[in-house]
Curated annotation (Swiss-Prot):
Organism of this sequence: Rhizobium meliloti (strain 1021)
Coiled-coil annotated spans: none
Lipid-conjugated positions (N-palmitoyl cysteine): C19
Protein name, entry field: Outer membrane lipoprotein omp10 homolog
InterPro entries: Omp10-like
Length: 122
């Protein structure tokens, strides 16, 4: 390439670079939205998966995806949920109250007083 052509390209590049009138605004990248409420999938220490979706609750095994329990839930407050469910294993109905301890942990108590925790599934 001829020296004159190189000089012309460099001058053109410099002229174009100087056309910007203001520095570009750099916006911080937002991270993935934090999950709110109980919507989504949760897992217990035994690997059983519970799903909350639009007022419907279900619990399934992870290996065969067998339905163990199903029912409905109501958000009593932003951090409290009440589940009315039927156990398909025991053929019993029960009420469970759960408190959202953290966005990733749900602490629950059955109507018989048994307590358990669920962890949000990533």
């Amino acid at each position: 390439m001829k020296p004159f052509a190189i000089l012309t390209l460099l001058a053109t590049a410099a002229a174009l670079a100087s056309c910007q009138s203001q520095p570009r605004e750099l916006r911080p990248m937002s991270s993935a939205p934090q999950a709110t409420g109980v919507e989504g999938s949760w897992v217990d220490p035994n690997g059983i998966v519970s799903t909350f979706a639009g007022g419907t609750f279900s619990t399934r095994t992870t290996d065969t995806n067998q339905l163990l329990a199903s029912g409905n839930y109501v958000n009593v407050s932003p951090t409290l949920v009440e589940i009315n469910m039927t156990s398909l294993v025991r053929n019993t109905q029960s009420k469970v109250n759960c408190a959202l301890a953290t966005p990733a942990q749900l602490n629950c108590t059955t109507d018989s007083g048994a307590q358990f925790s669920l962890a949000r599934r990533g």
